[in-house]
């Protein structure tokens, strides 16, 4: 950056106003989130000291439930099935299937106390016989039961629902009706046996990390979790601790009025807010940009030692990316051939929960390393080619430390799941929480690596005492610039990661609280800190290549960050609708999560404008990098906006959709499409800068890979996610969530499970080509840089 860049004060009154609005918004949002945190702790489902039958026999205790939660995490069951709809979609949802079994066995016990067969009356001209979660309710004709039987059956169903709903979890000692107590004993036996029984037809091998006592306690935790979904809150007699989720009408779980009301209010609010944001864009951002342009990155400077050393980061990104695709391919195959992988028995060697654990963490690793390396490469260029002493050595150290943490953590994950790491599973094994499976020791080291990245970015952006003092003076006088925001984004990433380590030295007794903090990392990383970094870095690149002025770039970033904080922080609530938190998460989550769509609309508008600028340039060296960056803006809007915030976040939609293949569709298109493509675009930017002004930079492999990714994503959507996800949503509505998540349901759609393969082939071909392209470009000699040649500068056509 030039001396003028460092000293020129901000003279844009609109930017000055937006800075203050951003500050107030950020403080207010996190203050509200703090208040909501207090309420979540206060209103989480309580754990009675004991559940007993009427004779005083203890069925399970609070200690059993807490130990069972530890067993659930230790065995990483969240990466085989799910709890409260959170986790893997391969196995059953333990909460829903257990709830249905409790209803079935309670009803059978009630029926056996008399002589009435266990049927339930269904709407219309049919009755439904309650079965297990792996079998849809069976329709029978009215003639199948006499009027007296039907009346008795309805009475038994009503009694079963009343007894389950009347369980008062606020009591220190819960005395259960005989029928419910007998049902719990039956489910305890079933679950304990299932956890220790090989079932290759379901892709399940016994949880090696669970001993007999811990298996029974894990069953107790699952049963308790199921009870929280049907037991009513004392202050809301029509609402369970999970807002009546999952949808299981057989036990009386249907959407609440709260869910229905706030869905429609949020839709109205969204359309109003979208109109307001579009007006702001037209009024203050969408006008001719006649301000002076800066072209700091348009000049190819001699590479600094640290820039040269980032090449090995890009190689690791490529390798982890390929490994992630391999794990994903095996997982996808497991849905349609659960016993074997093309005749090879992998379930014992590579159990599904380990594959999923790796597949979830791998994108975080390669996207994170891509951003870390790109940031470390671009920062010295931002500083004008200057570098602090020892920066190259520190970049090397960070690489090897990061590589050690990644490899050791993944090995620990595997050994923990396989039961090799027993007593130290929490610290060195697998924590069993989706996306943050790393053992706590590895989490701490990972946090240290992130902190080191921020420190290195700080040294790279302001390498001398003079530049640091000037930047500090700018910041404290309110002249906050894009360079400050880029560094603040790195701090934001690591600060939010801290909350995934609460409590630091052990597990929390409540899954509701554990999952609350998990979403602080997963959601706030993606929807707030990742978006923060993406917006700030993308805007700086545009500005420093002379495509937009600093004034317009900073205006755009401030406005987008305001919307990102509004939607990203409090929008966390849409993940907390059904996990046992207070009912206020429904209005809070839906209103603010719909705001997440608004910055994505701005991203699309800006992407269109950027595309026009690049197309209007006669020469632009970074067209390949910007192809990926524009692609990330598109998929951010489609994956996170259309398939996520614009539809699935609505409470009434989410009530039925939560935990289905439509969520997988949202996850794949938004994580890779939005942030993966951005990471790859930044890497291609660095590779082009690294090649120098006179190098022959072949863009063809990168372009082919880009279109392979896009075609692969589209094929996944229309040949896999939609053909399974939409019928699955129908199945939830017609038969309940447990049936829609059963293997019996999936077996009806084996053809569409197989149709995942074409998209995998196309996508993987792009990945292989791109990784080869990375290697070739890193081996390419760097061009002459003795003179600063502004070849990267866009030149007006004509």
Give the ranges of each region predicted by the language model:
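Membrane-interfacial, low-structure loops and terminal tails that flank and connect transmembrane helices
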Residues: 2-13, 287-310, 466-480, 613-621, ...
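Post-cleavage N-terminal segment of exported redox proteins
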Residues: 2-61
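Hydrophobic cores of alpha-helical transmembrane segments in multi-pass integral membrane proteins
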Residues: 19-39, 68, 72, 80, ...
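Soluble extramembrane regions of membrane proteins in the secretory/endomembrane system
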Residues: 42-259
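Perimembrane loop-to-helix junctions flanking transmembrane segments
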Residues: 53-56, 341-354, 656-659
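Hydrophobic or amphipathic alpha-helical targeting/insertion segments
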Residues: 77-83, 88-117, 143-158, 162, ...
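Membrane-interfacial helical/loop segments at transmembrane boundaries in membrane proteins
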Residues: 341-347, 421-432, 512-514, 518, ...
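Non-cytosolic membrane-interface motifs at loop->transmembrane helix junctions
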Residues: 428-439, 513-522, 581-592, 659-664
């Amino acid at each position: 950056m030039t001396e003028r860049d460092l000293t020129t004060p901000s003279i844009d009154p609109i930017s000055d106003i937006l800075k203050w609005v951003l500050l107030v918004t950020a403080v207010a949002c996190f203050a509200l989130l703090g208040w909501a945190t207090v309420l979540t702790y206060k209103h989480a489902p309580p754990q009675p000291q004991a559940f007993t039958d009427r004779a005083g026999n203890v069925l399970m205790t609070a200690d059993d439930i807490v130990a069972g939660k530890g067993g659930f995490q230790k065995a990483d069951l969240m990466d085989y099935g799910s709890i409260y709809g959170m986790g893997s979609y391969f196995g059953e949802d333990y909460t829903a299937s257990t709830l249905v079994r409790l209803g079935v066995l309670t009803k059978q016990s009630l029926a056996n106390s008399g002589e009435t067969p266990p049927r339930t009356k269904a709407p219309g001209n049919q009755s439904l016989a309650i079965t297990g979660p792996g079998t849809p309710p069976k329709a029978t004709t009215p003639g199948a039961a006499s009027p007296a039987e039907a009346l008795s059956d309805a009475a038994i169903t009503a009694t079963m629902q009343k007894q389950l709903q009347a369980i008062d979890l606020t009591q220190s000692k819960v005395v259960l009706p005989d029928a419910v107590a007998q049902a719990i004993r039956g489910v305890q036996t079933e679950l304990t046996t299932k956890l220790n029984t090989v079932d290759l037809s379901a892709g399940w091998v016994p949880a090696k990390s669970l001993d007999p006592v811990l298996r029974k306690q894990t069953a107790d935790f699952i049963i308790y979790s199921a009870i929280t979904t049907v037991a009513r809150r004392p202050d809301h007699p029509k609402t369970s601790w999970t807002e009546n989720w999952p949808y299981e009408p057989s036990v009386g779980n249907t959407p609440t009025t709260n869910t229905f009301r706030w869905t429609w209010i949020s839709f109205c609010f969204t359309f109003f807010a979208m109109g307001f944001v579009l007006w702001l864009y037209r009024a203050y951002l969408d006008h001719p940009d006649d301000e002076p342009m800066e072209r700091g990155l348009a000049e190819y400077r001699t590479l600094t030692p640290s820039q040269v050393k980032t090449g090995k980061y890009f190689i690791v990104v490529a390798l982890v990316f390929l490994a992630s695709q391999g794990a994903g391919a095996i997982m996808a195959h497991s849905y349609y051939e659960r016993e074997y992988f093309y005749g090879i028995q992998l379930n014992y060697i590579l159990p599904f929960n380990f594959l999923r654990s790796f597949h979830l963490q791998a994108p975080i690793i390669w996207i994170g390393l891509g951003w870390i390396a790109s940031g470390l490469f671009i920062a010295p260029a931002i500083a004008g080619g200057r570098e602090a002493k020892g920066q190259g050595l520190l970049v090397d150290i960070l690489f090897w430390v990061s590589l050690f943490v990644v490899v050791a953590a993944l090995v620990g994950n595997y050994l923990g799941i396989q039961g090799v790491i027993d007593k130290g599973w929490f610290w060195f094994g697998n924590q069993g929480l989706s996306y943050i499976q790393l053992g706590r020791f590895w989490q701490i080291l990972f946090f240290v690596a992130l902190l080191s990245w921020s420190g290195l970015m700080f040294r790279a952006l302001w390498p001398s005492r003079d530049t640091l003092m000037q930047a500090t003076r700018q910041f404290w006088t309110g002249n906050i610039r894009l360079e400050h925001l880029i560094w603040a984004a790195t701090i934001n990433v690591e600060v939010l990661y801290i909350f995934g380590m609460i409590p630091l030295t052990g597990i929390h007794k409540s899954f509701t609280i554990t999952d609350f903090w998990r979403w602080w990392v997963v959601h706030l990383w993606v929807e707030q800190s990742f978006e923060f970094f993406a917006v700030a870095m993308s805007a700086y690149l545009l500005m420093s290549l002379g495509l937009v002025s600093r004034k317009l770039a900073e205006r755009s970033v401030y406005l987008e960050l305001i919307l990102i904080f509004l939607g990203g922080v409090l929008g966390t609530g849409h993940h907390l609708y059904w996990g046992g938190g207070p009912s206020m998460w429904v209005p809070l989550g839906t209103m603010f999560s719909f705001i997440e769509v608004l910055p994505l609309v701005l991203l699309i508008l800006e992407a269109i404008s950027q595309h026009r600028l690049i197309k209007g340039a006669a020469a632009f060296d970074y067209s390949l990098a910007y192809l990926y960056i524009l692609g990330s803006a598109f998929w951010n809007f489609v994956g996170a906006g259309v398939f996520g915030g614009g539809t699935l976040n609505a409470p009434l939609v989410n009530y039925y959709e939560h935990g289905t293949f439509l969520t997988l569709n949202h996850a794949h298109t938004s994580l890779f499409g939005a942030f993966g493509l951005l990471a790859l675009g930044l890497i291609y930017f660095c590779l082009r800068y690294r090649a120098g002004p006179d190098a022959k930079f072949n863009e063809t492999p990168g372009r082919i890979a880009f279109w392979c990714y896009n075609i692969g994503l589209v094929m996944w959507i229309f040949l896999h996610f939609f053909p399974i996800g939409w019928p699955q949503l129908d199945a939830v509505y017609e038969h309940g969530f447990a049936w829609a998540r059963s293997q019996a349901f999936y077996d009806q759609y084996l053809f569409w499970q197989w149709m995942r393969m074409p998209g995998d082939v196309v996508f993987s071909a792009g990945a292989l080509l791109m990784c080869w392209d990375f290697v070739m470009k890193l081996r390419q000699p760097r061009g002459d840089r003795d003179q600063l040649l502004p070849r990267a500068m866009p030149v007006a056509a004509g």
